Amino acid sequence: MMSKVKQVIQDLTVEKDKGGEASRHSEEESHLLEEVETKNPGGYVKRKVRRLVCNFRWPTPNRHVDHSEGREDAGRFVGQETEAKRKSQEQWMRFSKWFLTPESDSHYNLGLIP
């Protein structure tokens, strides 16, 4: 088996050097050799999996930012965030208030109670 492997490697190097084609027999052997090298003994094919690496710098448009100049705006952003939270809470409470509020006196005065 080792002599076949050496022969295939030699044929491939000769093919690359000359720019010509190696023998068809060596091409078939190289294909078989590649299959053997990529398979585990159990018969499972070994494949390289490309994993995505998280890049946490993508949201930063410029890494050379003067961080001291953003301190004035920090208070404004915090204020905007609290305002947004307050508005969303008001929207949520608007729909739940009718369930929690007691009936008004005018409801009794109108005679709507059977």
Curated annotation (Swiss-Prot):
Modification comment: Ubiquitinated. Degraded by the proteasome.
Subcellular location: Cytoplasm
Domain of life: Eukaryota
InterPro entries documented for this protein: BEX (IPR007623), TF_A-like/BEX (IPR021156)
Keywords for the protein's UniProt record, in alphabetical order: Cytoplasm, Ubl conjugation, Zinc
Biased composition (Basic and acidic residues): 13-38, 63-75
Keyword Ubl conjugation: yes
GO cellular component, one term: cytoplasm
Region (Disordered): 1-39, 61-83
Pfam family, one: BEX
Protein family: Belongs to the BEX family.
Misc remark: The human orthologous protein seems not to exist.
The protein's name in its UniProt record: Protein BEX6
Organism: Mus musculus (Mouse)
Gene: Bex6
